[in-house]
């Protein structure tokens, strides 16, 4: 029996790329490192661009992931949504539409997607706005039956997360990325990939 091959492309901003992580793994690299490969071959591609909002991601994702995917492999898409739309004054309705367009196109191409919501920062006013945006992304994903990982709610008042941000100029460091990876791994990652969850995770 041939070994399953999954091509896994991830689009997002600098958090996806692990900027500020002393181990240079970020949450995505950590999640992959904890993913068993005895029954599956995973070929991963990080397609990150700094300071991107939903509009930019929706405009570039298909061309970029299309160059990595193959008809001979199982193709998976990770969409690491960002908080940049808050700075660009993009309405929540528009942000929803941008993600919906990505997921609708992915569904038409039989690409299974996982949406990872944006994590909270330290600014209370911004977090209040981000709460609505994160919830909107979750609603769009669930309506289209794609996986969604809520980063906002569990990290909002997490002491270690907030301390890590405070020590790293508002960005996650090693501890913060570890927390993000843990959430991804325990919110459907293995089921989404169709592989058994290791007992030690």
Regions found by a protein language model. Give the residues of each.
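A general structural detector for well-ordered alpha-helical segments in enzyme core domains, enriched
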Residues: 27, 31, 64, 95-102, ...
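Active-site segments of SGNH/GDSL-like serine hydrolases
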Residues: 80-86, 102-134
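Cell-envelope and extracellular/periplasmic
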Residues: 15, 47-52, 79-87, 142
């Amino acid at each position: 029996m041939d070994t399953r091959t999954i091509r896994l492309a991830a689009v997002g901003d600098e958090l996806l790329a692990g900027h500020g992580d002393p181990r240079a793994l970020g949450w995505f690299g950590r999640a992959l490192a904890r993913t068993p490969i005895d029954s599956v071959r995973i070929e991963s591609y990080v397609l990150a661009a700094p300071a991107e909002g939903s509009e930019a991601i929706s405009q570039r994702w298909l061309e970029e992931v299309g160059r990595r995917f193959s008809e001979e492999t199982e193709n998976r898409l990770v969409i690491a949504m960002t908080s940049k739309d808050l700075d660009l004054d993009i309405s929540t309705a528009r942000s929803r539409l941008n993600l919906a367009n990505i997921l609708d196109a992915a569904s038409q191409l039989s690409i299974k997607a996982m949406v990872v919501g944006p994590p909270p920062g330290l600014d209370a006013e911004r977090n209040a706005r981000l709460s609505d945006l994160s919830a909107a992304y979750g609603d769009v994903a669930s309506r289209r039956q794609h996986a969604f990982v809520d980063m906002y709610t569990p990290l909002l008042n997490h002491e270690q997360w907030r301390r890590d941000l405070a020590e790293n100029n508002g960005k996650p460091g090693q501890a913060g990325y570890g927390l993000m990876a843990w959430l991804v791994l325990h919110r459907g990652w293995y089921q989404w990939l169709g592989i058994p969850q290791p007992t030690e995770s």
